[in-house]
Swiss-Prot record:
Keywords: Ribonucleoprotein, Ribosomal protein. One of its GO terms (biological process) is translation. Pfam families: Ribosomal_L32p. Residues 1-20 are annotated as: Disordered. InterPro entries: Ribosomal_bL32, Ribosomal_zn-bd. GO terms for molecular function: structural constituent of ribosome. GO terms for cellular component: large ribosomal subunit. This is Large ribosomal subunit protein bL32. It comes from Corynebacterium aurimucosum (strain ATCC 700975 / DSM 44827 / CIP 107346 / CN-1). It comes from the Bacteria. Residues 1-19 have a biased composition (Basic residues). Belongs to the bacterial ribosomal protein bL32 family. The keyword Ribonucleoprotein applies.
Length: 57
């Protein structure tokens, strides 16, 4: 595993971390029990099986 040779300053660490941005989750339209809902793709299968309450979305 790579280890740093020199200590990184707190200012450099904070400025690097501040550049990180989270992306919005892409939503997919799904029809469940005659109701069209927009939910994240990873929850589609669980929603169709009834494991997730789609009323939250």
């Amino acid at each position: 595993m790579a280890t740093p040779k020199f200590k990184k300053s707190r200012a450099n660490t904070h400025s690097r971390r501040s550049q990180w941005k989270a992306d919005n989750v892409a939503l997919q339209e799904v029809t469940i029990d005659g109701q069209t809902v927009r939910i994240p793709r990873r929850l589609v299968k669980a929603a169709k099986l009834g494991l997730v309450d789609v009323e939250q979305f």
